């Protein structure tokens, strides 16, 4: 009944809120786990903060949360052009700061998920909004956006291990081998989640559009 459905939804909301303090309490984590992630790194509080977020992501997955998003790269680390990955300026300073923040915690998260048996049922999607140009940006010490060639990677449920798909030209500017679009990437993710992207349609401006616009194909070569 409608009443039962309402009661159930309120009960779910209550359980979600009541479980938050337990899930977010990292004091129950072993010292070895904190060290593995870099969450105890007093010399780099930004890295330690991201590491704690990675641990929290694992804890949410352990509680059955279906979707977890981690964000890296918007920190006050040196002013304009240095506080994120958007490398239009002072790229050498920028990536020297952000690389160490990301590297250890991200690797530790994958290892931890695997050791706990969670990775086989978890799809990890690691990506950005753009690649960077192989040349320096005019009038600046960084590199402009490059929509023609960039890297994303998948790990975990349903994908091949150690497999590379596609490549850019020798200059690093444009994808030329096994070219995949963002729509193909999304179609593949949806497939791994058990969804047929071609059936998720809605009518708009004369087209049956979908989450992959009006095109996109599953990249079968990356599937396990």
Located regions from the model:
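Ligand-binding pockets and gating/stacking loops
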Residues: 1-224
């Amino acid at each position: 009944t409608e009443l039962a459905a309402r009661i159930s939804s309120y009960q779910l909301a209550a359980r979600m809120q009541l479980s938050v303090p337990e899930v977010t309490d990292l004091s129950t984590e072993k010292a070895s786990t904190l060290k593995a992630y870099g969450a105890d790194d007093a010399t780099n509080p930004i890295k330690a903060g991201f590491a704690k977020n990675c641990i929290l992501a694992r804890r949410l997955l352990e509680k059955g949360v279906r979707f977890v998003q981690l964000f890296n790269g918007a920190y006050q680390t040196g002013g304009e052009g240095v506080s994120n990955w958007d490398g239009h300026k002072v790229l050498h300073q920028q990536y020297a700061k952000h690389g160490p923040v990301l590297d250890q915690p991200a690797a530790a998260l994958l290892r931890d998920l695997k050791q706990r048996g969670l990775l086989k049922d978890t799809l990890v999607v690691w990506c950005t909004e753009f690649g960077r140009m192989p040349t320096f940006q005019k009038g600046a010490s960084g590199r402009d956006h490059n929509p023609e060639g960039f890297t994303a990677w998948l790990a975990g449920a349903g994908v091949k291990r150690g497999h590379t798909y596609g490549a850019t030209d020798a200059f690093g500017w444009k994808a030329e081998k096994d070219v995949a679009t963002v729509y193909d990437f999304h179609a593949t993710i949806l497939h791994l989640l058990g969804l047929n992207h071609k059936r998720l349609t809605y009518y708009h401006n004369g087209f049956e559009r979908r989450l992959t616009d009006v095109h996109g194909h599953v990249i079968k070569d990356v599937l396990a």
